[in-house]
Amino acid sequence: MNTYAIIEAGGEQLQVQPGRFYDIRLNVPVTEFWENRKIVFSRVLMIRSESNTFLGKPWLEHATVNGRIFHPRRGNKLIIYKMRPKKHTSKKNGHRQTFMRLIIDSIFFNNQNL
């Protein structure tokens, strides 16, 4: 059984494993992040290691997930089209969400690397 953790990041919950890549939504400009910057997630909801499961209420104490920013990126453009019937008017807008691609390096619980 692989070791994994469930963390809260970017307003959503993610199941993460060491050595894998993930995209997390950001609410800050891309210019504030740079490549290979270390990042630590302390909001760990659950850790599963071999046959042991640790649950937090709501978060686990002394649990962290360490990772590195691989690169910031922007998602595909979403088109919002609003049309008012019988008025012959419409409005078209676009939006691109900012993401941060990161790689998870390790999962720590009680100062032990799992």
Curated annotation (Swiss-Prot):
Main location: plastid
Domain of life: Eukaryota
Cited Pfam families: Ribosomal_L21p (PF00829)
Location of this chain's protein in the cell: Plastid, Chloroplast
InterPro entries to which the protein is assigned, alphabetical: bL21-like, bL21-like_sf, Ribosomal_bL21
Gene Ontology MF term list: rRNA binding; structural constituent of ribosome
GO CC terms, sorted: chloroplast; ribonucleoprotein complex; ribosome
SUPFAM superfamilies: L21p-like
GO biological process entries: translation
Assigned keywords, A-Z: Chloroplast, Plastid, Ribonucleoprotein, Ribosomal protein, RNA-binding, rRNA-binding
Family: Belongs to the bacterial ribosomal protein bL21 family.
NCBIfam families given in the database record: L21
Record's subunit section: Part of the 50S ribosomal subunit.
Function: This protein binds to 23S rRNA.
Protein name as it appears in the record: Large ribosomal subunit protein bL21c
Native species: Staurastrum punctulatum
